[in-house]
From Swiss-Prot:
Phosphoserine: residues bearing it: S460
Residues that coordinate or bind substrate: K433, K435, S559, R586
Name this polypeptide is given: 1-phosphatidylinositol 4,5-bisphosphate phosphodiesterase delta-4
Domain EF-hand: 134-169, 170-205, 206-237
Keyword Metal-binding: yes
Cofactor note: Binds 5 Ca(2+) ions per subunit. Two of the Ca(2+) ions are bound to the C2 domain.
Lineage: Eukaryota, Metazoa, Chordata, Craniata, Vertebrata
Entry's Gene Ontology cellular component terms: endoplasmic reticulum; nucleus; plasma membrane
The encoding gene: PLCD4
Ranges for domain PI-PLC Y-box: 530-646
Length: 799
């Protein structure tokens, strides 16, 4: 069983030198720089490091976890150490998910180039592998781990230890019989290809064999006609033709003779079921398939909150890495909190906290570099400007000079249109969202009330929440950091018909016994140079839906805290839906989420809110929903809203959905699982007891969850065979989340893997669900095998 990488590992000069090992400095901070010896392992898939050249080594990283390699000039940390460490000798290993980057500095430019070229080559080889190649590589990795003495052979004792590592509990006599059957050389050990045969016997899938034989006349093969029947009857391929069946046979049948005879063997059938064509996610939804010519407000837009933070909201690190990660995962709206910095250079950080600071110009340069690497559709810079006049001018200069032609600085046709432009019209453009001077605005005097029902404990919570919220157009009751009695708050914005705009917010007057944390007047003077860069996305305060309809325009946008947005959905859900058919809304997390936790974005999407900003640095259920939602449509960051969320006469209310909606019933038979990993390393020696939980997220009436029983001591090939039933009123807004857990009767179940997708992207029939980690990284070959059936209308379980 030769690894797919063996040819390159034995012929490529860079990889040969990497296998010998080299000393490099591992850099974590300005004060932590340690010499370590790094070596590529013989499997070509892992890099180990040791403190000494001949010291005991431990794993550093796996090639499959690496996203890309950057040179030293692109590293914030290495750039800050140029006086000590030459940038030309440094490089950065960037990992998938949320794992911190690894900064390394070699002893010479040549050695740095060797590692950069070699790692690039290995990453390219891994990312180009298909499912079967990944499985072969996975087997090769396990063989390497099981072969303790590295003699290229595995004794039965080594196989037994390996089975335990692979989450397999098996009768010793049965395991030995499989071992003997695979040992064709009768040497008492298994070599490469013998181990493959042992694995095939171990993973023989009776449920797939039974399905195969139910459509095969002779039980040995599927003819073109039989396979066509299977695709049409079970897989619900509406446009199934003999041409489609033949194309799939050519793609997945491993034997040349089978391809010539137009038949599919059992191995080919299993290969099809495990492929992207057999995946639960419809391949037709993977590329850009939606109409991209509608106004921006007709789309859900992937959005990030406090993008510069890679940790918590109080003491976390600010880094351009936050922008890189957000943009590369398809995020199209990023937030930039800008404050006066030293030497006349604006800085970005979470104001009034201990978060670190980065230069505004570095953020802009990062956005310019990464904005369109994943998607060509427009990026929105949500500016929260707290700078002086002078530093606002500096901001405007950086935006103009660094972004150049990428920056949208005028309307597309030079005149004010009647609706927002489309993503297609704004391809590869960067838009600025922020405050804007309007000479025509009249002097207004407004009275705004603290939200009713927020007395006492809730009022105190709201006041504390406001301490950490920095939206450019905050809600009136959240403008001042205070704990106060319910009362009116008076503000008087002054719009001067000159070159600047001065907004004066009057601090509320405290009553006896109330605690004011800040009574200073807040003044913001807006610079025309910066104001002129805001074209289609002028930030305005939200007062009421009636006020917005009467006084605001389509090119204006309001921001809502999650607290207020959820309240509006409950109290005026249909008005919110109609508001979002003609104007953009941005929702941001509560200021109480100082740990950078997230809310469920689905609740806001239900009302048509376009920009639901997430703390993307924090993994969890909420980000699974967000990632799953934007996985469709090419991962471009824009998803077209359902028609009833685009119709300005819509009667839809997310809290009380009524007809006409095409309600559906979903039947899911959870059949089996394959190669489920044991992720909780603290439970050494235990084998997982897996169960599958299925969750529906959508309108409140559709939200539901069910789970299977657990299978004891089998993470390798558990079988459930259980059917779950869900009834969904508004499938257009529904998301499905499949979660595999390790049952524990003494404590909380441990997470193993998940997969989340939109209802509209789900394929019917026999499908594999390829699991992802908490960080959204593939756990290949871990999967669950299910049967999906969708029926029109609401049916009972007996159906």
């Amino acid at each position: 069983m030769a690894s797919l990488l063996q040819d390159r590992l034995t012929t490529d000069q860079d990889l040969l030198l990497m296998q010998e090992g080299m000393p490099m400095r591992k850099v974590r901070s300005k004060s932590w720089k340690k010499l370590r010896y790094f070596r590529l392992q013989n499997d070509g898939m892992t890099v180990w490091h040791a403190r000494q050249a001949r010291g005991s080594a431990k794993p550093s990283f796996s090639i499959s976890d690496v996203e890309t390699i950057r040179n030293g000039h692109d590293s914030e940390l290495l750039r800050s150490l140029t006086e000590e460490l030459p940038l030309e000798q440094g490089f950065t290993v960037v990992f998938h998910g949320r794992r911190s980057n690894l900064d390394l500095v070699a002893n010479s430019v040549e050695e740095a180039q060797i590692w950069m070229r070699g790692l690039h080559l290995l990453v390219d080889l891994v990312t180009s592998m298909d499912h079967q190649e990944r499985l072969d590589q996975w087997l090769s990795d396990w063989f390497q781990r099981g072969d303790k003495n590295q003699d290229g052979k595995m004794s039965f004792q080594e196989v037994q230890r390996l089975l335990h590592l692979m989450n397999v509990e098996m009768d010793q006599e049965y395991a030995f019989s499989l071992f003997q059957a695979a040992d064709t050389s009768q040497s008492g050990t298994l070599e490469g290809e013998e181990f493959v045969e042992f694995y095939k016997a171990l993973t023989k899938r009776a449920e797939v064999q039974e399905l195969f034989e139910s459509f095969s006349a002779d039980g040995q093969k599927l003819t073109l006609l039989e396979f066509s029947d299977f695709l049409r009857e079970e897989q619900k391929e509406r446009d199934c033709t003999s041409e489609l069946a033949l194309e799939l046979i050519d793609r997945y049948e491993p034997s040349d003779s089978g391809k010539l005879r137009h038949v599919l063997s059992m191995d080919g059938f299993l290969s099809y079921l495990c492929s992207k064509d057999g995946d639960i996610f419809n391949p037709a939804c993977l590329p850009i398939y939606q109409d991209m010519t509608q106004p921006l407000n007709h789309y859900f837009i992937c959005s990030s909150h406090n993008t510069y933070l890679v940790g918590d909201q109080l003491c976390g690190q600010s880094s351009v890495e936050g922008y890189i990660r957000a943009l590369k995962r398809g995020c199209r709206c990023v937030e930039v909190d800008v404050w006066d910095g030293p030497s006349g250079e604006p800085v970005v950080y979470h104001g009034h906290t201990l978060t670190s600071r980065i230069l505004f110009k570095d953020v802009v340069a990062t956005v310019a570099q990464y904005a369109f690497q994943t998607s060509d559709y427009p990026v929105i810079l949500s500016l929260e400007t707290h700078c002086s006049w002078e530093q606002q001018q500096t901001m405007a200069r950086h935006l103009t000079e660094i972004l150049g032609e990428q920056l949208l600085s005028t309307t597309l046709d030079g005149v004010l249109p009647t609706q927002l432009p489309s993503p297609e019209e704004l391809r590869r453009k960067i838009l600025v969202k922020g405050k804007k001077l309007t000479l025509e605005e009249d002097l207004e005097y407004e009275e705004e009330e603290v939200e009713p029902g927020l007395e006492g404990e809730h009022e105190s919570e709201l006041a504390l929440e406001s301490q950490f919220e920095t939206e450019s157009e905050p809600e009136p009751q959240e403008q001042n950091l205070q704990i106060k009695d319910k009362k009116k708050v008076v503000t008087c914005p002054l719009f001067c018909p000159s070159i600047c705009c001065q907004i004066v917010a009057q601090a509320p007057i405290s009553k006896p016994g109330s605690l004011l944390l800040s009574q200073q007047k807040s003044k913001t003077i807006l610079c025309p140079a910066l104001s002129s860069l805001v074209i289609y996305l002028k930030s305005v305060s939200f007062r009421s839906f009636t006020h917005s309809k009467k006084h605001y325009h389509f090119y204006e946008i309001s921001s809502f805290s999650e607290t207020k947005a959820k309240r509006l959905i409950k109290e005026a859900g249909n008005e919110f839906v109609q508001h979002n058919t003609w104007q953009l809304s941005r929702v941001y997390p509560s200021g109480l989420r100082t740990d950078s936790s997230n809310y469920n974005p689905q609740e806001l999407w239900n009302a048509g809110c376009q920009m639901v900003a997430m703390n993307m640095q924090t993994a969890g259920l909420e980000m699974d929903i967000c990632d799953g939602h934007f996985r469709q449509n090419g991962g471009c960051g824009y998803v077209l809203k359902p028609d009833f969320l685009r119709d300005n006469q819509s009667s839809f209310h997310p809290e009380r959905p009524i007809s006409p909606f095409k309600a559906q019933t979903l039947l899911i038979q959870v059949i089996s699982g394959q190669q489920l990993p044991k992720l909780n390393k603290t439970k050494e020696g235990s084998i997982v007891d897996p169960l599958v939980k299925v969750q529906i997220f959508g309108v409140r009436l559709d939200t539901a969850r069910q789970e299977t029983n657990y299978v004891e001591n089998n993470g390798f090939n558990p079988y459930w065979g259980q059917t779950l039933c869900f009834r969904v009123l508004v499938p257009e807004l529904a998301m499905l989340r499949f979660v595999v857990m390790d049952y524990d009767w003494k404590s909380r179940n441990d997470f193993i893997g998940q997969y989340t997708l939109p209802w509209s992207c789900m394929q019917q029939g026999y499908r594999h669900i390829h699991l992802l980690s908490k960080d959204g990284i593939s756990l290949c070959p871990a999967s669950i095998f299910v049967y999906i059936c969708i029926r029109e209308g609401l049916e009972g379980d007996e159906s």
